[in-house]
Amino acid sequence: MTRIKRGYIARKRRTKIRLFTSSFRGAHSRLTRTITQQKIKALVSAHRDRDRKKRDFRGLWISRINAVIRGNIKVYYIYSNLVYSLYTGQLLLNRKIVAQIAILKQNCLFMIANDIIKTKNPLRLYSGKV
């Protein structure tokens, strides 16, 4: 095989990768092979965790709503029944908005829940067994 002289092209490619990993510690920012592997690993983790973040936030919103709803003595409602009632009542409130209301203005959430309770079928309320 003939020798391929890359010269500045290879250096340019390695420099670009080095700039990406310049904040990494130890050999992960110095050795070319390790740099390449760590760059791939970092990009894979970033891609995976973007989806993971969406799942984590949805779980956080659900647990916040459930904690506030169950904490009230006057209106004992569980999360699943609340979301079902919001859905059947065609209220355009997603979990993120309801969680913000639950944290910042609990009275508003209880007003919404009471309104749903008055208009909905009482069988859907939580009484120990559904």
From Swiss-Prot:
- In terms of domain of life, where is this protein from? Eukaryota
What does the protein in this record do?
Answer: Binds directly to 23S ribosomal RNA and is necessary for the in vitro assembly process of the 50S ribosomal subunit. It is not involved in the protein synthesizing functions of that subunit.
Against Pfam families, the record matches this protein to: Ribosomal_L20 (PF00453)
**What is the native source organism of this protein?**
Glycine max (Soybean)
The yes or no answer to whether the keyword rRNA-binding is present is: yes
- Give a GO biological-process term: translation
Q: Which PROSITE patterns match?
A: RIBOSOMAL_L20
* Broad class of the protein's primary localization: plastid
Provide one Gene Ontology cellular component: ribonucleoprotein complex
The coding gene here is rpl20
- Which keywords, in A-to-Z order, does the entry hold? Chloroplast, Plastid, Ribonucleoprotein, Ribosomal protein, RNA-binding, rRNA-binding
Its subcellular locations are: Plastid, Chloroplast
Offer an example of a GO molecular function term for this protein.
rRNA binding
What is the name of the protein in this document? Large ribosomal subunit protein bL20c
